[in-house]
Amino acid sequence: MKIAEIKGREILDSRGNPTVEVDVILESGIMGRASVPSGASTGEHEALELRDGDKTRYGGKGVLKAVENINTLIAPALKGMDSMDQRGIDKAMLDLDGTPTKSKLGANAILGVSLAVAKAAANYLDIPLYRYIGGTNTYVMPVPMMNIINGGSHSDAPIAFQEFMIRPVGAKTFREALRMGAEVFHALKEVLKKRGLSTAVGDEGGFAPALDGTEDALNCILAAIEAAGYEPFKHITIGLDCASSEFYHDGIYDYTKFEGPKGEKRSAAEQVAYLEKLSWDYPIDSIEDGMAENDWEGWRMLTERLGNRCQLVGDDLFVTNVKFLEKGISEGCANSILIKVNQIGSLTETLDAIEMAQRNGYTTVTSHRSGETEDATIADIAVATNSGQIKTGSLSRSDRMAKYNQLLRIEEELGNRAVYGYKKIARNFKA
């Protein structure tokens, strides 16, 4: 079915900042709608999110230029194209843009159209989006990586690491995993209350208390897991997003940026040793961006030390880009890739990155951004690609719940075909 009309508009995301929403209307009248997320901590090689820069509107964060590009440049170019030719449509937009970082049209403009086209095609065929993208072999429900303590650039808490996540690996179904996560989240709230700490939440719905560093945050999570009636390692493991690029400068990992005078300053070797110690002292089985995006030697060291027993996820390192992923594979850096659709800026390129990762034995983690909307597309992408893992925030804020609730619906629809789990990485636990 051919594209008849494309409409872009400016809406607000979960932080109250403008973002792009797109409607793609087919000749049949069927419509697909998508909105675009936005990150707070971003990799320097990410596709360019086009902002207006007009300080008199939204502090310069308006997206009217991107919307105008959709309505005046992209829409005429795609009108009449077959909505089911996803690769052809995405290529047409990339050719129209003509820049390596999508700086002419804006990655937010291109992505909004790309996702809305896929939704329109799925709606026209009257099939779920995950089935349209993934075909008949879609059955794996993702393990949720729930960010229950926020630090770094996602909160005002004096902790360098950006996310402390729980992973309900012992669940039998996604529904059970969601319940386990919610119970730990509420138990953590009580742990923090008893210490007189704030239970206000950060950008992704996790708590942002004034804890005394990384170990204090981890100990609070352990206490919450046990208070909820679960056993660390067996039922629930912990994942970290260090977001190390945020506090890396001139070869030094400078924790004082977020933690003040009490923070450490570590070399790459010391950073690796610190992460290794944490992985032995706590039930940690996934570490994201443990090293900075440009510290490739540090990444090699970390992968050599921990890669055979811990998932090492490249986010800023790979930015969902096959060029950087290919380099990581050839140089032995990381063993997993974080998938963020807005890092690369089109559905086709996102799927290409997932395919390359899976073909080379890397796990994939489908991810949200800290600035989100009610759009739940990433839930469908996680199932469509059998990703096995999803990062979409904590157990509060409706922008995060939209994804979890969509996954509940998908699991219900799949019925007994659904399998909960992910490609496991062997881990030697501390005796």
UniProtKB/Swiss-Prot annotation:
It comes from the Bacteria. It is found in: Cytoplasm; Secreted; Cell surface. Binds a second Mg(2+) ion via substrate during catalysis. (2R)-2-phosphoglycerate binds at residues 162, 340, 369-370, 391. Pathway: Carbohydrate degradation; glycolysis; pyruvate from D-glyceraldehyde 3-phosphate: step 4/5. GO terms for biological process: glycolytic process. Catalyzes the reversible conversion of 2-phosphoglycerate (2-PG) into phosphoenolpyruvate (PEP). It is essential for the degradation of carbohydrates via glycolysis. Belongs to the enolase family. This is Enolase. It comes from Phocaeicola vulgatus (strain ATCC 8482 / DSM 1447 / JCM 5826 / CCUG 4940 / NBRC 14291 / NCTC 11154). The gene is eno.
